[in-house]
Structures are given as C-alpha cells and as structure tokens.
Amino acid sequence: SLVGSEMCIRDRIHSGDSACSLPPVSIKPFLIKEIENQTKKLALALKVKGFMNVQYAIKKDQIYVIEVNPRASRTVPFVSKAKNLPLAKIASRVMAGEKLSKFNLKSKTKDMFAVKESVFPFNKFPNSDLLLGPEMKSTGEVMGFDKNFGMAFAKSQIAASNSLPIKGLAFISLKNSHKEEGVELAKQLVKLNFKLCGTGGTADYISQHGIQCKKINKVNQGSPHIVDVLNAKKIALVINTGGGNSETQLSDAVALR
C-alpha cells in the first residue's frame, strides 16, 4: 500500500523543515505512477515488512532516489490523520505476521487536501538566522485540511502563526533566475490589492512588464533602505529569493532576514 506526499523544500535543507502536501499538487501524473512503480520494486527487492520510507527528488521529469529507509518517518502521523487510517497500528501488525490484505486501506478522506507546515521558534529568538540548512530548525508541525488546496495551505500557515496579510505593501527581491516567474507573482499580488516595492533590479524588471513597483535601496546603498522600511512596520509581505556569494550580497541578505 503506497501513500505519497509532496514536499515543498529546496535542496540541502533538512526534510523535517519542509512543508508537505497530500495528495501531491504539482507532480505530473505520469511521474506519480512511475514513483509508485519504483517504490513497489524497492519494497519487494528489500523484502520489507511494515513501513518503508523513500525520499525522491524530481528534476526535469527525471526521478532520483535520495534515500530508502525500512522504517517509519516523521510524516506517518500527518499521513495517518490525513487519510484517517491507523497506519502505525497496521504496519506493526504486518510486521508481526498478519497479511496486509486483511486491512481496509481505502482513504476515508477522499477529495481532501492536507498540508503539513513546520513551526519554527524564530519569534522567541529574534537574533537567530532564518536561513534554513542541513540542520533541522523546526520545533513542531501543524496541519491544514480542506477540499481546496489553497485553503488547506492557508489554514496550515495560520496554525503555524505565519501572518497572512490581505492588503498593504509587498516587498519583492528576486534572484535573476526567478525574475521571469516573479512577474506573474507580481500580477497576482496587484489583483489582491497589494502595492509593490522591490530592490533595484527586481523593481526595474517588474516595471518593464507594465506593473508599478517602487524602488527601495538595499542596505549597502544607504538609508532609507529596506530594513528601515521594515522597522517602520510599513511592509505587509516579504518575498525574498535574493542572495549571492559576495560579501556585500551576504551582508544584505543577513540584514534583511
């Protein structure tokens, strides 16, 4: 019996800090079928009884196996609640010799979306760096549940105490490789009644596509800069994928976070 969820996370970040959707929302159907096929082959080859946890990565429709563990994972409680099935109990009984076919494994929450979100302690440690990495930083998990994916995601953010503004000034700072996607994002924010501002390159790129976006200085460009505006509580939403390897870029990124 297979249950597949989709993690939303960058590479080189601990999987325990991920957001997670069940069922997957952006993986192509033929890739899901291939993942199911590969997982069955792995389970049979390894002769696993009970849980088997497999982590896959997908890039350009190519599937990569990251790791295979013959054990449960931290997503079992989330998946059990999402499917309304006692998966840990079933797996334990299978390990003890009972047949999997004995159990009714049909989901009791059909046509529902479940979103798991990680909870971070950054509010209690104001000087800590928000940047995620290989070391797990989250201290808990919450879950959003709804017939609509967007609403399920919103519920998960509210439960994790992540504010969801509905209007105001949105600040955008994007890597060059993200700017094309950022135009569509900017259009959606404007439709939601947000005003836009951004660092020089991002603001110029968005403005070139007919969307009004006010330019704000980076920290290294002098006051008034983005941190001044943030400290003045004038920003409702921050979307930042910027960064870089130079000392100035790293310093700006740390100051913004």
What is each PLM-predicted segment?
Residues 1-166:
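ATP-dependent carboxylate activation and anion-phosphoryl transfer catalytic cores
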Residues 179-257:
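Feature captures the catalytic cores and cofactor-binding loops of soluble hydro-lyases/lyases
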Residues 132, 136-151, 155-158, 164-201, ...:
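C-terminal accessory/binding modules appended to enzymatic or scaffolding proteins
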Residues 54-55, 80, 172-175, 245-249:
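Glycine- and other small-residue-rich loops at beta-strand/loop junctions that grip anionic moieties
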Residues 28-32, 175, 192-193, 246:
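A generic secondary-structure micro-motif detector
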